[in-house]
Amino acid sequence: MVNYLSLKNNISSNLFSGHNNINQEPICVGDYIRFGLLITEGTKERTQNCEGLVIAKRFSNTCCNLTVRTVFQGIGVERTISLFSPKISKIKILKHYKVRRAKLYYLRRKENVKKK
């Protein structure tokens, strides 16, 4: 008989073996984070630092997607990132806000939501 639990652990360890974001502190909705995004321009590769408030967190079988919102030049910008993507070089939690909702979509209607 096949041991499905060990098979599942083996597959998940192979899937996430190259990811550097796997062993870090947990990211929750309401965290103000800064993440480095690897961008390839021609033959050069550079890291673009972005920061914002996590307004949503979605799970699927093998990945976790975060929706990060920031205000840039008076315009709200949202970016959806995959937590275990190889394009994410680093993630740092700058501040944790205590929230009572799982999704903070109501912040889209607020005008001046900034880091306090």
UniProtKB/Swiss-Prot annotation:
A Gene Ontology annotation in the biological process aspect, one of them, is:
translation
The record's listing under Pfam families reads: Ribosomal_L19 (PF01245)
Q: SUPFAM superfamilies from the xrefs?
A: Translation proteins SH3-like domain
As recorded in UniProt, coiled-coil segments are: none
Q: Name one GO molecular function term.
A: structural constituent of ribosome
Q: Which Gene3D superfamilies match?
A: 2.30.30.790
Alphabetical keyword list: Chloroplast, Plastid, Ribonucleoprotein, Ribosomal protein
Q: Which InterPro entries match?
A: Ribosomal_bL19 (IPR001857), Ribosomal_bL19_CS (IPR018257), Ribosomal_bL19_sf (IPR038657), Translation_prot_SH3-like_sf (IPR008991)
**What's in the GO CC field?**
chloroplast; mitochondrial large ribosomal subunit
Primary location group: plastid
Q: Where in the cell is it found?
A: Plastid, Chloroplast
Q: Which family does it belong to?
A: Belongs to the bacterial ribosomal protein bL19 family.
HAMAP family named in the record = Ribosomal_bL19
Record protein name field: Large ribosomal subunit protein bL19c
Lineage of producing organism: Eukaryota, Rhodophyta, Bangiophyceae, Cyanidiales, Cyanidiaceae
Name of the gene encoding the protein in the UniProt record: rpl19
